[in-house]
Amino acid sequence: MKNYIVFDLEWNQSANGKERSVPHFPFEIIEIGAVKLNENFQMTGEFHRLVRPQVYTQMHHAISEVTHMNMKELRSSGELFPDAAAEFLVWCGGDAVFCTWGNMDLLELQRNMDYYHMENPFPKPLLYYDVQKLYGLFCRENARISLDSAVEEQNLMEDRPFHRALDDAYYTGKLLTMLGKTPGPDAILPFKSVDYYRLPSDKKEEIRMTFPGYSKYVSRVFDSKEDAMADKGVTEMMCYRCGRMLRKKIRWFTPNQKTYFALACCPDHGYLKGKIRMKKVEDESVFVVKTLKLTDEEGAQSIIQRKEDVRKKRAERNRMKRKQKQAVKKAATASPADGRSASSRRRRKSKSSITTKDV
């Protein structure tokens, strides 16, 4: 039987700044909290463990301030992370569907497991439900808000504080239960999220998903942005309704080297707008998340206008560069002439200083 595991983590970090962090291990988990929901989105159980830190053994002041935890409590009541994580996975069961508020918790869970050389039991790709995303999609016109704001907005407050793992998991579970009733499972369950901790290792593993209203593609890792944008799989635009490969009306362009846009038109389904987000990997290589979405005439015009704005800004930058080069060149050619003029003035002054007495 399928269970929804709604979990939350609290973590600590270097108390002496990022430069003192352990490479590839910026956050150390100090608390695991979770609630279990059945297929009807009813809560059936809770899980909670404190974790005894082994790496960052001094509490970062901001973490202590938010969570109200201290190192004495963690040392006396916490378990070693491998033990706590193993117990958590056993409690989850084999048919678990993970749910979190935001996209950080699964990533940090796996990063901590890797640090302690634990086997990663999750499937690849790892699909989960981002309840923050679902709430924004169905309750806030795609706007993302904080957990406490969503709970307050839905009048779900209880005598439980925020910023502790079990309490945050509980409130996230309450919101998921609410969404499971309205708009209901048929509406929310198609919108799975993809965890990016373990990326596709080759072209065969690249991820292509279709949702109500858009499609998503997650690429393998590329050495550079240029390599990514030279790949046909990255830049192609296919209508997710009929599978037709489309010719672009507006080729991929970027206003900031991080996000790219394009526009195509399907003969049967109309305009299709594309968005590519370049995401860095720790070694400065990149992977691509591409979304394609059908749009109307107004949406198409917004892409066309954005492209024109980028063209104007680029033209203005080029004009300023040419102007600066001309100014530098003019200054360089003017300097020798000024030098000769000064010499001439000195010679004329020297001659004019000769008097008749000298003669």
Question: What is the role of each PLM region?
Answer:
Residues M1-L107, Y271-K313:
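Conserved non-catalytic scaffold segment of RNase H-like nuclease domains
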Residues D83, Y170, K258:
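Short Asp/Glu-rich motifs
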Residues M178-V359:
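Acidic two-metal-ion nuclease catalytic site recognized across multiple nuclease folds
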Residues F25-I32, K36-T67, V90-V218, D283-F287:
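Metal-dependent phosphoesterase core characteristic of DEDDh/y 3'-5' exonuclease domains
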